[in-house]
Structure formats: structure tokens, C-alpha cells
Amino acid sequence: MHRRHPSFRLRALLAGVPAAGLILMGTVGTASAAHTPANSQAALRLAVQRLLTHWTHTNHAIKGVTLKQVGSTNWSGYADTGSGFSSLSAKWTEPKISNCSTSGPEKAAVFWVGIDGFSSTTVEQGGTGAICGAGTPLTYFTWWEMFPTNNIQAVGVKVKPGDKISASVVRTGTKYVIKVTDSTTAGNSFTTSPQSCSTCKNSSAEWIGERPSTSSGPLPLPKFSTWTVTAAAVKAGSKSGTIKSFTDNEVTMFNKKGGHVLAQPSALNSAGNSFKDVWKASS
């Protein structure tokens, strides 16, 4: 029998400017945080936000699938479970998206690290993503979310395949700081101000590739080059370690009926801090 299933909420706010509490960061040698994006970038960001407004990300459990790993119709990666998680981080190179066109159906993939959401209804997370279709050109972006305190906040829309990304979530008491850094392309990095959540369970930590869902079900998963997660670190209570230092759940993404694999993580490396997530099919 498959084990616990993640529960994840991802919704958007229509906003033409960064949300309150967000500190945009210039990378070394780039424009300062006060830089205003060009009109074309602002328009693109609004177009992305319009698509994001109808996303929902509650996991859909698969019935009758027998696995040693966890089965999901929208998540692929690793989730640690336990209690008192206070930080996690990872690095990756932004995957390249293909079979994705402006005039085609809406497709999306997001890659993130986060606390909670696997066995709770709160989510504190940040990462990168790509969206296309329904009249919007293929666009890569950075984002963060606190749910239910905040919904998804799209930040930079200038991410490119091959960009070097690092992401972290750090909790101090009931305050969370989410940071995503694009060390390759300016205008995508950010650090949030401390975000409050007194009801967050801090019961899981995740490194996940995901396809969002709408009211009609999960979106098609665009083909992505292998997402390689490295330098994954996590802390819970006084214990610090890697993914394998805690109870780790390997999450494989299946289509809606559980008939075939859409994305699948590799085994962890010997250090327990790296894995590869491989695209298999769109739907």
C-alpha cells in the first residue's frame, strides 16, 4: 500500500507589483532592489498571474497502487516527516521545458523546497516554475507561498534554463523567511520579510517537482530536462542533516488513474543530499 500523501495548496494573487513583505534582491553586479522591471516584464508577469489564479494544488491520492514509495498525481521528489522542522535548503540548475507552446493547452511545472504540506494543510515554500499555453508564452519564474497566511507570490519572470538556483525556508518560532536566489540572471532573487504562522505544524520538509491542478484536475506536465537537486540540508529540533537523516518518503508522480509514471525521483546519493527527478510523460 502506498503511504502518506502530500497535501499542497498553491493559489495566486493578482498583483502587478511585489507583495508586501517581499524584499527583492539584486545579485552581485546587478541592479539594486529598487529597480523597476521594464514594461514588457511587468506585462509578462501579469499574464503569468492570470493563469495562476485558477490553480489548485491539493494532492489527489491514488487508490489501489502498491508501492514501497509514496504515490501522487502531482508531486515527485522527497518528503521528510517528523516534527519541529525549522529549516531546509537545496540547490539546482533550472530545468529546460519543451513540448510547450503559447497556443497550446496550459501546462506548468514548479520546483520547490518547503516545510509542511505533506501531512498538514499549511505550506511554507519557495522555488521556481515554468508555465505556458492558453495564450501565454513559455515563462520561467521565481515564487514563494505561505498558505493560508499568504497565497502564491510570483516574483521574477526572467529565469532561464540553466540558471543556478538556491532556495531555503528558515523558521524561528512562528516566523518564516523564504529565500530564492538566482545567481545567474538578475531580477529573480528575493528574500521575504518574516512571515507569521501560529498554526503551521512543522511536520514535514520537502524537495518537490510538481504539476499544478485546476478544478478539472492536474495540468499536463510539460517535458523538463532532469531536475537535479544538490546540497539538500534540513534541521528539526537540535538535529541537522540531509534528506536521509530523517524519515524520508520517495514520492513518484502518476497519472490520474495511477496507470503510468509521469515523473520519478532517483535513489538518494550516498550522502543523502542529492537526487535526480526525471520526466516520463505529460499525462
Predicted features and spans:
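Exposed, interaction-prone regions of secreted/extracellular proteins
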Residues: H2, A12, S32-S283
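Secretory targeting and sorting signals
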Residues: H2-A34
